[in-house]
Amino acid sequence: MALSAGATLAAALPGRQAARAQGTGGKLVETEPPVQAPAFTFTDADGKEHGAADFLGQGLVVNLWATWCPPCVAEMPALDRAQAALAEEGVKVLALSSDREGRAKVEPFYRDRGIRHLGLWLDPRGAATRALGARGLPTTVVIDRKGWERARLVGPAEWDKPEMLAAIRRLVGPPPAQMKQT
């Protein structure tokens, strides 16, 4: 199954990166069969290291982006709204910035654009980007509550659209029973 998500990066990326972007067609493409997501690390705004394993039990929407990437910038408000819509269901949008300047670059970016629901997560050395096999930005990987990659999308998307939110909910699986009661 694939959901339309807007224009691809193909025109903006050279060589193999363009081929990879065209390969997803700007659509959320399910990973069939699902594969165990690789271990990857990133840091928070204070420089503390985290990994995907820290979020086991939560659904993850891992977005690899940068402030210098126009399609990335364009989709950030939708990712912020998606995080607001999904937070109570135990789904975390991890927007991992690859900006080398880290917090000094991303914090004012968030403030200037009114990004309020996304955490400030950093991947300035590209460790998560390499581990997830991203060949262009933005790349987004949906990981279920058990740590399995369920889908990915290369290019920007309207993450807050009802059909995209429904797809994310279906792919990550239902929240634990105790979350349903709150």
Indicate where each model-derived feature is located.
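N-terminal "domain-start" segment that seeds a small globular fold
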Residues: 21-52
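Alpha/beta-hydrolase fold active-site loops
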Residues: 59-60, 91, 138, 148
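N-terminal export signals
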Residues: 1-20
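Conserved hydrophobic packing residues within short motifs/helices of P-loop NTPase cores
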Residues: 60-62, 94-96, 141
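Short active-site neighborhood of thiol/selenol oxidoreductases, capturing the structured segment around
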Residues: 52-70
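Structural microenvironment flanking redox-active thiols in thiol-disulfide oxidoreductases
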Residues: 74-113, 124-130
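Thiol/disulfide oxidoreductase modules built on the thioredoxin-like
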Residues: 111-116, 123-170
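Non-globular targeting/processing and membrane-anchoring segments
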Residues: 174-182
